[in-house]
């Protein structure tokens, strides 16, 4: 919400009053004097009118989780444990997932209460790299590398996937870099060759890498550099 609209919502202030207070330098947002009425006020913003606190602002929270197998990427599920069940109950409030993983896919998952941040993370236009370690039933050869780089046609959506980079690191394992997120995309890409994915593990999203010190099921807060990378 714009700062001038935020102030105009106060019952004792008119829109004209709000404009004059802003122009006079009476407003501080997160400790900084703001004279621009279009300045954005978020639920996380601390807003002060002179010495009066108008909004304390709730803390923005950002977490990295090493998702284990056997839990769903959801906030609630009637049948299965969810990734939120891995957090203490007092931390679960308002958390949502930025970039889901399938039930038996493991690896990096990001959770936050900051909707704008998670939208930047997952917007299709962001082309943010996602890196996966993949193990398959049948051997992986150069045909896969070439086809993934050219893009594969997905009949259901009638689209061609963006070029992806596949790096074989063993007869039946590879590292795959995607620049988009489609439904079951990795499994469908290997399915183009009738090759079943046996293990799928996400290692990185954008510039955020899974912390090697985190065992499956463990989590930690993101540091400032990781938060600002999105």
UniProtKB/Swiss-Prot annotation:
Give the reactions, separated by semicolons, that this protein catalyses: uridine(516) in 16S rRNA = pseudouridine(516) in 16S rRNA
Q: Please give the biological process terms from Gene Ontology that the record holds.
A: enzyme-directed rRNA pseudouridine synthesis
Where does the record place the catalytic residues?
102
State any GO CC term. cytosol
Which EC number(s) are documented for this chain? 5.4.99.19
Keywords, A to Z?
Isomerase, RNA-binding, rRNA processing
| UniProt cross-references to Gene3D superfamilies, sorted A to Z | Alpha-L RNA-binding motif (3.30.70.1560), Pseudouridine synthase I, catalytic domain, N-terminal subdomain (3.30.70.580), RNA-binding S4 domain (3.10.290.10)
Q: Any idea where the S4 RNA-binding domain is?
A: 1-68
* Record GO terms (molecular function): 16S rRNA pseudouridine(516) synthase activity; pseudouridine synthase activity; RNA binding
Q: Which family does it belong to?
A: Belongs to the pseudouridine synthase RsuA family.
Function according to Swiss-Prot or TrEMBL:
Responsible for synthesis of pseudouridine from uracil-516 in 16S ribosomal RNA.
Q: What is this protein called?
A: Ribosomal small subunit pseudouridine synthase A
